[in-house]
Swiss-Prot record:
Gene3D superfamilies: Peptidyl-tRNA hydrolase
Assembly, per entry: Monomer.
Organism: Desulfitobacterium hafniense (strain Y51)
Gene this protein is translated from: pth
Protein name: Peptidyl-tRNA hydrolase
Keyword Manganese: no
Length: 185
């Protein structure tokens, strides 16, 4: 069994924001696979089969800073080891249009990842970072991540979400090393 968790904030006012890149990717994946989310584990959960293995998709509804609670609840209930968890989230240190897949690491200042590390008790879980770029001069970082993507960024976002779907699907079916080799370019 595997878990793919996409981080974001619940509520319509956050739906199209940079900080919701994880939710956006999971929504696109669920749409592609014709899956429906249902409330469970302080989140919205969908399930599917990939590579002969059950895979849960999770969008925590706890707000970003407490995302780890929802991830831990689902992982504990289904006995999913951290090495079988992928967390998809926004990353300001990557330019928009870039992905980075990692098998472990620090939170890098991301509160959703800090929460996940604290709740799982380890840094050893997979992450797919979706680049959202840095704010331009005069923008506060918090305001930037909670702002919507610009009209100019939307085509790039669409392309990167498509690549992200392929990356998490390959991770679930064939493993992280293969996915990293293909998508960390």
């Amino acid at each position: 069994m595997k878990l793919i968790a996409g981080l974001g904030n619940p509520g319509g006012q956050y739906a199209e924001t940079r900080h919701n890149a994880g939710f956006l990717l999971l929504d696109c994946l669920a749409e592609e696979l014709k899956l429906d989310f249902r409330p469970k584990f302080q989140g919205l959960v969908a399930e599917t089969m990939m590579g002969g293995e059950k895979v849960y998709l999770l969008k925590p509804q706890t707000f970003m800073n407490l995302s780890g609670r929802s991830i831990r609840e689902l992982a504990q209930f289904y006995k999913i080891a951290p090495k079988d968890i992928m967390v998809v989230y926004d990353d300001m240190d990557l330019p928009i249009g870039r992905l980075r897949l990692r098998s472990s690491g620090s939170a890098g200042g991301h509160n959703g990842i800090k929460s996940t590390i604290a709740e799982l008790g380890t840094e050893d879980f997979w992450r797919l970072k979706v680049g959202i770029g840095r704010p331009t001069a005069g923008w506060d970082s918090a305001r930037y991540v909670l702002a919507s993507f610009t009209k100019e960024e939307l085509p790039v976002l669409e392309e990167i979400l498509d690549k992200g779907i392929k990356a998490v699907t390959l991770w679930a079916k064939e493993g992280g090393d293969k996915a990293m080799n293909l998508y960390n370019r």
